[in-house]
Amino acid sequence: MKLLFPIFASLMLQYQVNTEFIGLRSCLMGFGRCRDHCNVDEKEIQKCKMKKCCVGPKVVKLIKNYLQYGTPNVLNEDVQEMLKPAENSSAVIQRKHILSILPQIKSINFFANTNLVIIPNATPVNSATVSTMTSGQITYTATSAKSNTKESGDSATASPPPAPPPPNILPTPSLELEEAEEQ
């Protein structure tokens, strides 16, 4: 029993346990199930080896809503027209369309910006910061800087750092009143 408990506990605490031996293999990042035949209300999205990846109507609605309202400024007009609900649309056309759009969404860089950093008594330094955000993954930030180190080194040694200001005690009205009362 002492030997079985750590093995059982490690299986229960794993992030993702392979449940293929039970027959409940999942697909489409856990939103779908691999089955021989899809139910009436489910749609086939991908293939799981010899089976079909079936997703329910809630997942299909979630994907459509995300593509329609979550990314309207990223996608071009042709894709937006295809996403509008149609009365005579078949499951095959929808599946091909959804799978063709996903690589476009992944390839777009949402968070790219370029800044200009200015250091006093030195030359300007151009820096570009690019960070990408992917759901469920760690965000990495890369910064590249370009400057002339000889010029900035010369300018840094040419001017000494400014001396700190001398400590001045500023007279306050209450201090002036006390001095006037003493006299």
Curated annotation (Swiss-Prot):
Localization: Secreted
Cysteines paired by S-S bonds: C27-C53, C34-C48, C38-C54
A GO cellular component annotation in the UniProt record: extracellular region
Superkingdom of origin organism: Eukaryota
Coiled coil regions, renumbered to chain: none
Main location: secreted
Key words, A-Z: Antibiotic, Antimicrobial, Defensin, Disulfide bond, Secreted, Signal
Annotated signal peptide: 1-19
Entry keyword annotation includes Signal: yes
Family: Belongs to the beta-defensin family.
Name by which UniProt lists this protein: Beta-defensin 129
Organism: Macaca fascicularis
UniProt gene name: DEFB129
